[in-house]
Every structure is written in structure tokens, then in C-alpha cells.
């Protein structure tokens, strides 16, 4: 089954991400990975992780739940990344970010 990413939220201090996805229904996945799942990505879940663009990546999925608009709004409002002021300077202001390559292109 292929899943399509609608939106993704990253918490850089802990490396946890949340993605709104579409499979058989709209869902929210809570996961940890070394890769970023940008909106529009299409991936297939497998036992050891996911297959994205014909390559297998490890991913730890903590939970999958039906999409809830209120929960998604709460997650978006507490999003640490990317901070608005960083867009102006192109510099990340998070000293505790554990993500090696910024998916937003910040340095």
C-alpha cells in the first residue's frame, strides 16, 4: 500500500516527526527517522522501514492514528521547526537540533 504525505512537522530537539498522510484514509503518523518526508512524497511501509523513491530507509513508527483536525492544529502550533525568524537569516536558531541535514536548507 502506498502512502502520500500531505504535511510534515519536525521537532528538531528530539528528532521526532509527525506526518499527515493519505492511504486508505487520512491519518497522522508519529515517527523517528534520519530522513524527512516532505509533502507530496509517496512511500510504501515495509517491515524494516519504508521504501521511498525505490530506496529502503529505516524508520521507527510510534503510532498511526486517524486524522484529527484539532490534534493536527495543536501539533502545528507547537512546531519548533522552521522558526519564522530563521527564514530571514537562513540560519537555524536551534542549538539542540539533532537533525544532521536541515530539510528547510538552514545552516
From Swiss-Prot:
Q: Quick one: a GO biological-process term for this protein?
A: cellular response to starvation
Which terms are listed as keywords in the entry? Cytoplasm, Stress response
Disulfide bond positions? none
Keyword Translocase annotated = no
- Signal peptide start and end residues: none
- Which InterPro entries is this protein grouped with? Anti-adapter_IraM, PmrD_sf
Where, subcellularly, is it found? Cytoplasm
For this record, the Gene Ontology CC terms, alphabetical, are: cytoplasm
Q: Which NCBIfam families match?
A: PRK09919.1 (NF007393)
Q: Which family is this sequence assigned to?
A: Belongs to the IraM/RssC family.
**Function as written in the Swiss-Prot or TrEMBL entry:** Inhibits RpoS proteolysis by regulating RssB activity, thereby increasing the stability of the sigma stress factor RpoS during magnesium starvation.
The entry's protein name is Anti-adapter protein IraM
From which source organism is this entry?
Escherichia coli (strain 55989 / EAEC)
